[in-house]
């Protein structure tokens, strides 16, 4: 499953011709060195491309429009090496349509106290030029990322690399297409939403298909293809029979193999990157898709249960943003299920009926076939595991009627105090920040859903930057959250974001 194209980022340095050719030569030389060193650092998920120094209105405008036209360009990093009169940037910025980062840095890290003169001052005045440029971008109301510090500082490089992933999420958002297999679960509110507004805001296409249309693809899968995939399952996972006859167990597993192959063929043929199902409308499917959906998520597809297309799109988006990350720990659809309220051991047990992505699993993954009361179908095969420990974020995109809101909660994943042998699903257990009581109150006050798109591999800052680029509200629930401040923030936001 492809998770986006091989994007690149342009590095554009601002200056002017006031200082003479020698100064401009050094500006270009310094810019080249920075780009070369950044690319050599191994810190960046995408290549940075040096561009000639921008010193005139015409060149700035031409460069930004070339960036617009280049499908491989995911964004522009701007740096003002010298002073660069900001009126020169107006037309270029006005016509630019991709992610923008202002790297507010300078070539030298330390002031050369013994030798500094006015030539050096004119040549190295980012503190001056960056403010001029920043003023104009702010006046024009353009959303961008500002990162200030020395370019060789590891923390600055980490922030710039982090922004790259957000920029790719911004670019790829308009390529997300969600296949709805049947409609939302009846009478459920939070999984509903304005699909037209979502396409206008995020670029998402959300289409519905009768369940039996996709079921035909499942029925057309050959027994030979099913047998090959079942063999892969048996080689990869621990099979826990729970007393079932081995052949009967294998038949249930084979049903999910057929669903996985059929669904994937349908999604590839129709060019969808996310899918939703609903246990209340399974048509001719023999089982609720469980193992099949888990495997599709692991391949990069988004998923939402009970028709939740917003969460399906967010899971896909976050998988794209985290793609290729070293030591990636996983991204999945999740659902808040039940609490542990023992003082000092508070947390939320996260799971779903079946569909938690094994990318978040810690250690060996097992397969079980167990009854499922919902759906009125055969006992479905599913992958069973517990999730990794460590920090992550849970996000929820909700439709408030007049606008979308993205909730972002920082969480700490932990191991449960005891094993849960009778619970045949993939699970995670986390304590939300700042604590369970405050986080739950804040989540409910902000209107968050019971479904989330969860990841270990992205940060609240990255998702908040994505929301800002989309022009929607982001509500952070983290270690600094208090209910009083959050309630005030929600009131202020309602005035700013409401139509």
Residue ranges with predicted function:
Residues 60-73, 90-92, 260-269:
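Short, well-structured alpha-helical segments in soluble
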Residues 3-26, 175-184:
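Short beta-strand segments enriched in small/hydrophobic residues
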Residues 45-47, 104, 109-244:
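Cap/lid and interdomain-hinge subdomains that line or gate substrate/regulatory clefts
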Residues 25-41:
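Short catalytic helix/loop segments, enriched in acidic residues and glycine
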Residues 73-83, 101-103, 272-277:
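Periplasmic-binding protein-like
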Residues 231-232, 236-324:
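Long, internal scaffold/assembly segments composed of regular secondary structure
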Residues 375-499:
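Extended hydrophobic packing segments that form well-structured cores
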Residues 300-425:
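C-terminal catalytic subdomain
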């Amino acid at each position: 499953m492809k998770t986006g194209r091989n994007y690149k980022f342009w590095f554009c340095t601002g200056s002017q011709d006031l200082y003479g050719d020698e100064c401009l030569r050094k500006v270009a030389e310094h810019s080249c060195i920075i780009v070369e060193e950044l690319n050599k650092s191994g810190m960046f998920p995408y290549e940075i491309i040096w561009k000639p120094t921008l010193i005139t209105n015409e060149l700035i405008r031409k460069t930004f429009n070339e960036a617009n036209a280049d499908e491989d360009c995911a964004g522009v990093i701007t740096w003002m090496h010298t002073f660069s009169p900001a009126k020169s940037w107006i037309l270029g910025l006005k016509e630019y349509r991709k992610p923008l980062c202002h790297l507010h840095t300078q070539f030298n890290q330390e002031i050369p106290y013994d030798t500094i003169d006015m030539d050096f001052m004119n040549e190295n005045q980012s503190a001056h030029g960056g403010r001029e440029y920043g003023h104009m971008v702010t006046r024009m109301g353009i959303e961008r990322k500002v990162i200030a510090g020395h370019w060789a500082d590891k923390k600055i490089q980490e922030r710039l690399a982090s922004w790259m992933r957000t920029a790719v999420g911004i670019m790829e958002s308009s390529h997300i297409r969600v296949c709805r297999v049947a409609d939302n679960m009846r009478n459920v509110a939070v999984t509903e939403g304005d699909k037209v507004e979502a396409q206008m805001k995020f670029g998402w296409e959300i289409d519905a298909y009768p369940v039996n249309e996709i079921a035909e693809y499942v029925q057309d899968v050959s027994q030979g293809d099913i047998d090959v995939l079942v063999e892969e399952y048996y080689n990869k996972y621990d099979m826990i029979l729970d007393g079932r006859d081995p052949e009967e167990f294998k038949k249930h597993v084979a049903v999910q193999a057929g669903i996985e192959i059929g669904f994937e063929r349908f999604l590839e043929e129709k060019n969808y990157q996310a899918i939703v199902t609903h246990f209340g409308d399974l048509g001719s499917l023999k089982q609720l898709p469980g193992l099949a959906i888990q495997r599709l998520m692991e391949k990069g597809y988004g998923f939402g249960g009970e028709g939740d297309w917003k969460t399906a799109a967010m899971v896909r988006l976050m998988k794209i943003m985290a793609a290729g990350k070293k030591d990636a720990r996983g991204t999945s659809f999740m659902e808040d299920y039940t609490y542990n309220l023992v003082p000092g051991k508070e947390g939320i047990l996260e799971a779903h009926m079946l569909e938690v992505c094994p990318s978040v699993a810690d250690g060996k993954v097992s397969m079980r076939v167990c009854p499922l009361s919902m759906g009125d179908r055969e006992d479905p095969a599913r992958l069973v595991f517990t999730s990794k420990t460590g920090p992550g974020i849970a996000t929820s995109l909700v439709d408030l009627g007049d606008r979308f809101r993205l909730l972002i909660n920082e969480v700490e994943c932990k191991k449960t105090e005891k094993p849960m042998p009778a619970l045949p699903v993939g699970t995670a257990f986390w304590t939300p920040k700042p604590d369970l009581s405050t986080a739950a109150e804040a989540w409910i006050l902000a209107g968050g859903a019971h479904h989330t798109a969860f990841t270990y591999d992205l940060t609240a800052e990255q998702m908040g930057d994505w929301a800002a680029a989309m022009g929607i509200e982001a509500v952070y629930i983290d270690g600094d959250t208090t209910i009083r401040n959050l309630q005030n923030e929600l009131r202020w936001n309602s005035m700013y974001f409401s139509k």
